[in-house]
């Protein structure tokens, strides 16, 4: 079986990766970046096959956009690898050190997790981001992308693995599962002892499948039913700009807004302005009964709309009585990703920050900033929506764990 063979190679490579010096890792990342640029034509030809097949199957435009590569996106992947090379290596850091009364020095040292399995869908850039971040954090990585992007992923992964190996990275540190059979994923999720952690990136069904079926520990990522609450005191121009950015800039990503909640006190004045602007960008509005009464041209929202991550130019809109109803709605329907309030009321802003139980909570800013690069972490491997180990954008530190190191001078326990 392909996945078992590659997992064994990865496990062997991970032991060597754990003690690799920072200079070697950084040199490999730079060479990997250069290799992507030098082989851009090869990547684009492979990607063209995937895009043509996606269009033949009539996939949504937003999904084709996530799949599609061009020279600009390849350059961005290369820049991401170079940025990771410039980041501080967390491996070996002593985070805390204390001395016990008996003279023992006890410290917490950052160490690699080991072998990380990535299961993801359409975006080929994840192949480069995941390989680079796992490498810098001293981990081996097994990549399993979606069948939609198989040609692109094979091209990118082979280029990266070859460049890394030539730079002194152990063979088997970067591997792609080329078999698109779902049984390979099922086997991958059961490889306890060979794979230390699985990180799924994709839609609801993929993440749900991994969480429910993996016996290997999982970090839940991604699904983003994100909300923006426009409070009664909000600056209308600011609110409009934030909502348009959060919905229109890249609707097919997990930090795009899916539901806007509007305070009843401003609904009649604000909604027509917002709907007009969004409609000019091709956004379909699905509104509650009161929204539809104020803006008759919008579609009627159903219960399902409040719980849907559209990943498309569709937005659910609901008028709420006050901040209490907004918080209640978010608590019921949020996936714990990113939520924002637009307000000039300090008390409401602070209450929103404290009350909303999501990985990223904003005041007067777009949810689109929930991103490793925007947070200053460099490329991210995913956005965790769980509370254990990692939460929010996962950078280098989140791809390590720690161990206790104890320095003694002959102490024995009495």
UniProtKB/Swiss-Prot annotation:
The keyword Protein biosynthesis does not apply. It is found in: Cytoplasm. Gene3D superfamilies: Aldehyde Dehydrogenase, Chain A, domain 1, Aldehyde Dehydrogenase, Chain A, domain 2. It comes from the Bacteria. GO terms for biological process: L-proline biosynthetic process. Pfam families: Aldedh (PF00171). It catalyses: L-glutamate 5-semialdehyde + phosphate + NADP(+) = L-glutamyl 5-phosphate + NADPH + H(+). GO terms for molecular function: glutamate-5-semialdehyde dehydrogenase activity; NADP binding. Its EC number is 1.2.1.41. Transmembrane segments: none annotated. It is an enzyme of class 1 (oxidoreductase). GO terms for cellular component: cytoplasm. Catalyzes the NADPH-dependent reduction of L-glutamate 5-phosphate into L-glutamate 5-semialdehyde and phosphate. The product spontaneously undergoes cyclization to form 1-pyrroline-5-carboxylate. This is Gamma-glutamyl phosphate reductase. The lineage of its organism: Bacteria, Bacillati, Bacillota, Clostridia, Thermoanaerobacterales.
